[in-house]
């Protein structure tokens, strides 16, 4: 049998691959690596290993679910940072085992369940395990809401962090200027911060470096920038959301998220989680702007309020569920109205829990009747309940 592990970014997938290689190679277990940036020869060899069963574990990005990938016997599919994938993508991985009516076991992991996932954990066939405590040595992150007008104060705070030998993330919603959106971009912010911090020195006397990271950079350049930041040679990293997952720098103690009102709750929580990984007190600054409007929208205010009030991923998900809705259970939308015909997720919890307990008995004792019931109400869309 084979296992597959799919991660949303190459940075995270490669971290998993290197760690698993170290654990599994001594046991004689072969691990294959699949990503969109592989050279043709390397990719052909990996695909052959997957198809003939030589690769017992396959680690990769979205490349794992492409049509050319054929598993011999997929028994377990692991999806890391599950909230970053769409319903169709998760189904595509599950459908990689198609013979004899069998389906692979699925393990989905996330620090921030999206509305659909949280609702599915309540009402679908999804068992949930929760780790609700910080790892040893971690400190809770303080979250502050700061108006864009106080931007200079945030830069002063960065200077203080640099003087203490700490490192800082600054996240922007765009890579470059957009004619459609009046938002700060990573390229300009990198230029501005480089100028503002050009004379700042770290405790060892070296001038503070300000780096830039975004998805359009060549893979080698991205690796070079990330290595410099991880090794502590770079004090400030200006980035887009490519650092949302898979980046672990214990010395980073300040996260600044620009135009925080434009980000979703799960994304904000994931970005905040890039700091607070060491023993130093850490903070997340949510810079917000109302633009031409007199105030933020109700949903934006609700998101920022949730971030300032809790660090709990499941509580964040519950707030997100209230704000956005659970999405379609029998479709691909992951937020919005549930579109249930009779039930109401908020008011019928007790009845739905009872139905969930009784359903296995009905399926076991009256399979023909249950099949008719499923066909009538689900209309051939039951596959969506598995993702």
Regions found by a protein language model. Give the residues of each.
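Inter-lobe coupling/hinge segments of SF2-like helicase ATPases
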Residues: 1-305, 365-369, 387
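C-terminal accessory region of SF2 helicases/translocases
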Residues: 291-387
């Amino acid at each position: 049998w084979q296992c597959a592990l799919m991660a949303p970014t190459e940075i995270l997938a490669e971290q998993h691959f290197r760690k698993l290689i170290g654990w599994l190679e001594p046991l004689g277990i072969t691990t294959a690596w699949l990503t969109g940036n592989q050279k043709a020869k390397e990719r052909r060899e990996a695909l052959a290993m997957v198809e003939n069963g030589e690769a017992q574990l396959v680690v990769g990005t979205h490349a794992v679910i492409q049509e050319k990938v054929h598993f011999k016997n997929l028994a377990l599919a692991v999806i890391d940072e599950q909230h970053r994938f769409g319903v169709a993508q998760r189904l595509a991985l599950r459908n990689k085992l198609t013979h004899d009516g069998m389906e692979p076991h699925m393990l989905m992991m996330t620090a921030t369940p999206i509305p659909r996932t949280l609702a599915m954990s309540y009402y679908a066939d999804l068992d949930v395990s929760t780790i609700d405590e910080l790892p040893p040595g971690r400190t809770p992150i303080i979250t502050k809401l700061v108006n864009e007008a106080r931007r200079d104060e945030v830069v002063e705070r960065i200077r203080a962090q640099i003087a203490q030998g700490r490192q800082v993330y600054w996240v922007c919603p765009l890579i470059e200027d957009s004619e459609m959106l009046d938002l700060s971009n990573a390229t300009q912010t990198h230029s501005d911060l480089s100028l503002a911090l050009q004379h700042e020195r770290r405790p060892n006397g070296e001038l503070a470096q300000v780096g830039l990271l975004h998805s359009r950079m060549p893979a080698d350049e991205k690796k070079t920038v990330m290595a410099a930041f991880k090794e502590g040679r770079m004090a400030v990293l200006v980035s887009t959301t490519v650092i949302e997952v898979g980046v672990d720098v214990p010395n980073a103690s300040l996260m600044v998220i620009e135009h925080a009102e434009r980000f979703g709750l799960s994304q904000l929580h994931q970005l905040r989680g890039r700091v607070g990984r060491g023993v130093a007190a850490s903070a997340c600054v949510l810079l917000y702007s109302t633009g031409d409007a007199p105030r933020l929208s109700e949903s934006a205010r609700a998101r920022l309020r949730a971030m300032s009030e809790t660090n709990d991923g499941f509580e964040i998900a519950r707030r997100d569920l209230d704000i956005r809705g659970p999405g379609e259970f029998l479709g691909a939308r992951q937020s919005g109205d549930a579109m249930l015909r009779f039930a109401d997720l908020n008011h019928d919890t007790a009845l739905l829990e009872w139905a969930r307990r009784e359903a296995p008995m009905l399926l076991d004792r009256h399979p023909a009747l249950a099949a008719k019931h499923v066909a009538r109400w689900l209309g051939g869309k039951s596959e969506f309940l598995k993702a």
